[in-house]
Amino acid sequence: NIQIICCKHTPACCT
């Protein structure tokens, strides 16, 4: 999922 990858680069994206 794109969210998982985004979380790796930007934690704020994970929330």
UniProtKB/Swiss-Prot annotation:
List Threonine amide occurrences by residue.
15
Entry's localization field: Secreted
The UniProt entry's GO CC annotations, sorted and at most eight, read: extracellular region
* Keywords of the record: Amidation, Disulfide bond, Neurotoxin, Secreted, Toxin
Q: Which domain of life is it from?
A: Eukaryota
Alphabetized GO MF terms: toxin activity
Please tell me in which tissues this protein is expressed: Expressed by the venom duct. Is mostly present in part 5 of the venom duct (distal part near the pharynx), and less abundantly present in part 4 of the venom duct.
- Record's comment on post-translational modification: Contains 2 disulfide bonds. Contains 2 disulfide bonds that can be either 'C1-C3, C2-C4' or 'C1-C4, C2-C3', since these disulfide connectivities have been observed for conotoxins with cysteine framework V (for examples, see AC P0DQQ7 and AC P81755)..
> Family per UniProt?
Belongs to the conotoxin T superfamily.
The entry's free-text remark on domains says:
The cysteine framework is V (CC-CC).
Q: What is this protein called?
A: Conotoxin tx5d
This protein's species is Conus textile (Cloth-of-gold cone)
What lineage is on file? Eukaryota, Metazoa, Spiralia, Lophotrochozoa, Mollusca
